[in-house]
């Protein structure tokens, strides 16, 4: 760290990191470098099920909320193993759980019941939106679903984007559905949302649109520090929007 102080400090905003299978030693390196900027770690989709050293990995991540991917919940639900899943989460010492319906056909009322049920024992992150890039829903539906899941007990609602930013709040080309996001934000407090933003372009857009304290998800481990610089205005993409003064030169 430099000997001088720019007066730049992180002021809120969750950074939700996606893990695709890093080992314990890799996570030790990640935490040593960027642990101060990581708020939640998601073990993507069903990777936890096939990770042989999962307990060791969770020990390294101790102190960080860890959640298993929502797709794994969908598999468990489809096989009627919800009670076994709850027990396993408890045995692993996990306090957070993600519930989604991005792939399976889960009736709306049933999803709300499950959120309410899991919220008795866990901190629930629910996810809204389909993983099917061709599935498009009207903004009012997103708003209705998000509000319903928050009322059912979800701590935060994740807006689907996939790890590649090609579904949900994104078009298949990767372009942001800005009108959809704006309408959601008009009706729902953005503090209750986690926007999936796996690319630098999407991260910068959210920081400029909603400020440095916006909650962002599906952040790759190697992108945690770059995202932090976007939040603090230490990167050209957000320098003018974040730092005081509107006429700062950008080189």
What are the residue ranges of the model-derived segments?
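Active-site-adjacent beta->alpha loops and helix N-cap segments on the catalytic face
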Residues: 25, 47-60, 75-84, 101-122, ...
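Active-site mouth loops of central-metabolism enzymes
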Residues: 11-25, 44-47, 67-81, 127-141
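Hydrophobic faces of well-ordered beta-strands that scaffold small-molecule active sites
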Residues: 12-19, 38-43, 66-70, 97-99, ...
């Amino acid at each position: 760290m430099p000997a001088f102080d720019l007066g730049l400090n992180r002021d809120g905003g969750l950074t939700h990191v996606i893990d695709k299978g890093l080992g314990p030693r890799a996570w030790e390196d990640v935490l040593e470098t960027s642990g101060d900027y990581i708020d939640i770690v998601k073990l993507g989709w069903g990777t936890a099920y096939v990770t042989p050293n999962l307990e060791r990995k969770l020990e390294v991540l101790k102190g960080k909320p860890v959640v298993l991917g929502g797709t794994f919940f969908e598999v468990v639900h489809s096989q009627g193993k919800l009670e076994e899943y709850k027990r396993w989460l408890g045995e692993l010492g996990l306090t957070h759980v993600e519930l989604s319906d991005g792939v399976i056909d889960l009736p709306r009322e049933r999803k709300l019941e499950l959120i309410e049920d899991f919220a008795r024992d866990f901190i629930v992150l629910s996810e809204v939106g389909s993983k099917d890039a061709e599935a498009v829903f009207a903004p009012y539906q997103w708003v209705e679903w998000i509000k319903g899941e928050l009322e059912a007990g979800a701590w935060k609602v994740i807006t689907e984007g996939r790890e590649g930013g090609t579904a949900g709040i994104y078009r298949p080309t990767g372009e942001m559905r800005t009108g959809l996001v704006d309408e959601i934000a008009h009706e729902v407090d953005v503090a209750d949302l986690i926007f999936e933003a796996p690319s630098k372009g999407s991260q910068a857009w959210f920081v400029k649109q909603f400020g440095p304290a916006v909650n962002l998800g599906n952040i790759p481990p190697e992108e945690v520090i770059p995202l932090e610089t976007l939040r603090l205005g230490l990167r050209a993409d957000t320098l003018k929007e974040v730092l005081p003064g509107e006429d700062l030169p950008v080189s």
